[in-house]
Curated annotation (Swiss-Prot):
Pathway: Amino-acid biosynthesis; L-histidine biosynthesis; L-histidine from 5-phospho-alpha-D-ribose 1-diphosphate: step 1/9. This is ATP phosphoribosyltransferase. Lacks the C-terminal regulatory region which is replaced by HisZ. InterPro entries: ATP_PRibTrfase_cat, ATP_PRibTrfase_CS, ATP_PRibTrfase_HisG, ATP_PRibTrfase_HisG_short. Belongs to the ATP phosphoribosyltransferase family. Short subfamily.
Length: 209
């Protein structure tokens, strides 16, 4: 039987991804005791799990370094890779939103400056609305940008909204709801079809899809 290689995003989705695999009967003991290992074999289930940073999951899948991956829809929208997105896994739910200072009197304003970790998503959103904006790419806490005058608004993931409120910010507009997704390499789906299809069906049954 072919071994299926699956990439899991480090960070907020990792624990829930492992729980999903456990819920369909996969022995995830080696994942729980992996220490600093980045590649963990699950020989009983003919799986190999690779832990990578979330933005890298689409790249690993697209180039066939792994057969499939679990990653947030936010990453997929930003990366825009050629992948099969086969399942909404129904966890890691949050929203992409436009937010700014509670003291901002008018939204939107002409030629806004937009701070974000997701420049492609922000650009596409405002272009679709015919709004001219300047995108300012950031890596750190984007909430800081409106507070110090770097940007008028931010585009970011919002879960509870607590961080925004604590920093005097509010949501002006929601862009899209996001959640964890299962994505496949197109070639792998053909060459390992039976094994991958079986795994997809087990996950789909558990997630109700």
């Amino acid at each position: 039987m072919n071994v299926i290689k699956i990439a899991l995003a480090k960070g907020r989705l990792a624990d829930q991804s492992v729980k999903l695999l456990e819920s369909i009967g996969i022995d995830c003991g080696p994942l729980l005791d992996k220490g600093r290992k980045l590649i963990v074999a699950l020989p009983k289930d003919h799986l190999e799990v690779v832990f990578v940073k979330a933005p890298d999951v689409p790249t690993y899948v697209e180039h066939g370094a792994v057969d499939m991956g679990i990653v947030g829809k936010d990453v997929l929208l930003e990366a825009n890779k050629q992948l099969y997105e086969v399942l909404d896994l129904q966890f890691g739910k949050c929203k992409f939103s436009v937010a700014g200072s509670t003291s901002m009197e008018n939204y939107p304003t002409p030629h806004m400056r937009v701070a974000t970790k997701y420049p492609n998503i922000a650009k596409n959103f405002f272009q679709s609305k015919g709004q001219s904006v300047e995108i300012i790419k950031q890596e750190g806490s984007v909430e800081l940008a409106p507070m110090v005058g770097l940007a008028d608004v931010i585009v970011d993931i919002v879960e509870t909204g607590n961080t925004l409120r604590e920093n005097g910010l509010m949501v002006f507009e929601d862009i899209v709801e996001i959640s964890a997704r299962l994505v496949l390499n197109q070639v792998s789906y053909k060459t390992k079809h039976q094994e991958i299809r079986g795994l997809i069906d087990r996950i789909a049954e558990k997630t109700g899809k």
